Structures are given as C-alpha cells and as structure tokens.
A protein has these predicted regions:
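Phosphate-/polyanion-interacting regions in eukaryotic proteins
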Residues: 1-12
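Nucleotide-activated chemistry modules centered on ATP-dependent adenylation/adenylyltransferase
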Residues: 10-44, 52-200
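Metallo-beta-lactamase
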Residues: 49
Length: 200
C-alpha cells in the first residue's frame, strides 16, 4: 500500500526505492483472529466525496431496495449537496471528523517533502471500522474504470492507486482475513467509465 500509494511522490521528488527495502513493518502485539460478528447484508455504506460518481452510486443502490447510508470524512458543502440531490438528509448519514497531526504541519513549514498520500486507503480502513461498529456488511465505493490507469506514461505509477481495482481486491481480502469475515468492500461503478457515468 505505502510503496504503490506513494509512487507518484517518489517520481516527482526523484526518489529511487524498491518495494522490498522501502519499509519494514513489525508488531509486538498479540495476534487476534478476525471477528465472526454477524453483519447486516441488506445495508450498504457509501463513502461520499461530493462528485457525480457518488450521486450515481447512491441513486442506483436505492433502486435495489438497499438501506443506503452515506458516509463522510470531513464533509464539505459540495458533499452535503451531493446527498441532497440523491434524496438524503444529514440525519441519514454517518460523519467522521479527521484532523492532521500538528507535527506534520510543522515539518512542512520546515521544508520537508510533502505530497500525495493514499487518502482513499484511509477511507477504506475508516469505513471498515464504521461497518464493524454499525453491523453493516457492505461498503460500496464509486471508483470507475479509469482509476486503474497509470498517471505517468510508461510506468505503473498511479496517482489514484488506492482507488484501483488492485488495491480494492487486496483490501477486500485483507479485511476478510484480519478484520471482518463477512464484509464486502467493492466499487459499484468499477465496470464503467466517466462518460457512461455522466449518461446515467
């Protein structure tokens, strides 16, 4: 996740690094099994960013008679307008507030390198936590097919790696193995492109 998610950051800053030596992650905690908690399969959490893709996902899932719950991290005014267009109110939503550690801001002020981080991966882990706490089994994203495409010609570097199908599959498997066995993390719009979404 970190290696591929920071691919564009490495490229723009001329940093040469390989996947095997980039980072070592160790833990000293006790191993825990994934929970067998039963989840509601008729409800779906939909992370909302504020664009047309989220509106389409919300509208289409309503047609399937799913209990749809919009989910926000630090919602903007555009985010609230999105759910209103889709026929939801603030009372229908789950909202998480996120703050950036002051130490990161201080490091930026001192001239340390700054760049894109895998924000959608943070959304993935946060929505999985919300799914567990609320007993909901489905998290439906609104990532479309172009999220898989490289943003640097002739490379596999993808500014949106954590929106890609590769990440989606990896996170789904990780969640079922270590977090929630019954959780389904998927992008509802993955098979279609932006033009097709605009038509919908």
């Amino acid at each position: 996740l970190y290696f591929h998610g920071l691919g564009e950051f490495f490229y723009l800053n001329g940093i040469s690094v390989d996947e095997n030596s980039f980072m070592y992650i160790t833990t000293h905690g006790k191993k825990l099994n994934s929970t067998g908690k039963e989840l509601n399969n008729h409800k779906v959490i939909v992370p909302v960013g504020g664009g047309k893709d989220s509106i389409v996902t919300l509208e289409l899932l309503k047609e399937y008679e799913m209990d749809v719950i919009p989910f926000f991290v630090n919602p903007r005014e555009a985010s609230w307008r999105t759910i209103q267009v889709a026929g939801f109110t603030k009372d229908d939503c789950i909202v998480v507030e996120r703050t950036i550690d002051r130490k990161l801001i201080d490091l930026n002020d001192k001239g340390y390198l700054n760049g894109h981080t895998p924000f959608s991966a943070m959304i993935a882990f946060t929505s999985a936590t919300v799914a567990f706490l609320t007993g909901i089994s489905n998290v439906a994203l609104s990532n479309e097919s172009s999220a898989n495409e490289s943003t640097v010609p002739g490379s596999k570097i993808n500014h949106q790696y954590s929106k890609s199908f590769e990440f989606e599959q990896d996170f789904h498997e990780y969640s079922r193995k270590y977090l929630l066995q019954e959780m389904h993390y998927f992008s509802f719009l993955r098979p279609i492109n932006e033009l097709q979404i605009a038509k919908l």
